[in-house]
Amino acid sequence: MKKLALVLLCIFILMLPSTVSAERKIPILIYHSIDEFKGHGVEDLYVSPANFEKQMIYLRDHGFTLLTFEQWNDAKNIDKPIFITFDDGYKNNLNAFAIFKKLETNHFKPKGTIFVISDFVGRSNRLSWLELKRMADSCLFSIQSHTANHPDLRKIKDYEYELKVSKEKIQRITGHPVIALSYPYGLYNDKVLAETKKYYSFGLTTIPEPFIEKGIQDERYLLPRLYVKYSTTIEDFAKLVDNK
């Protein structure tokens, strides 16, 4: 009887998931400009509209669910969650908006998060408040904060303006909650984290890896992101989102 119990115990232990296999990797992608690169600026901060559409089709055809940070807690109940983010609020993000509308069906609901620099809104190459409002109301995009002026947050003193005023301005225009901050240049320190926690529920870095929940302190304020570049092929993209 003891021998049988020991055998059953060993079988039970072998059936338990290992720590490594139990780790759930959630990709959070970062884009900037959705446009053809015309020789100005940094090439790998662009992704062509054609490539972006192919990437979204890949996600659709491979069973991914695109989420915004308002849906963070839903991720644990979804088989293949992914977050699509755009930094800086460039006007060419309207290309992503058009592609999302084109691909949206009853079975595929594309969603993305645009992190805008609130004092830059309305500049010639940036989205206007009217455009941001329209995107937010479509429920295809969540509009969140990339601060007021895009400073290195480690070197400033007026956190209230960069974090609180930026948040309030975006909320007032879009009519939707602002709960996430993208750190300019991906830079932060303990002071930045402490100030961010006063106004936001999430902080996003540019640490190049998928998110793995580890239960560490300030985990939601240290969210990593994976860059999608102009040079990213669809094969590269597949490896990126499938964590290969």
Where are each of the predicted segments found?
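Positively charged n-region of N-terminal signal peptides that target proteins for export
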Residues: 1-4
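Bacterial N-terminal signal peptides
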Residues: 7-15
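Electropositive, surface-exposed helix/loop patches at the edges of structured domains
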Residues: 93-112, 240-244
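C-terminal active-site subregion of NodB/CE4 polysaccharide deacetylases
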Residues: 22-85, 90-93, 154-244
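Short, well-structured secondary-structure segments
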Residues: 27-30, 65-68, 83-84, 106-124, ...
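Acidic (Asp/Glu)-rich catalytic clusters
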Residues: 98-109, 125-144, 197, 213-217
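Substrate-binding clefts and substrate-entry loops adjacent to catalytic sites
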Residues: 144-157
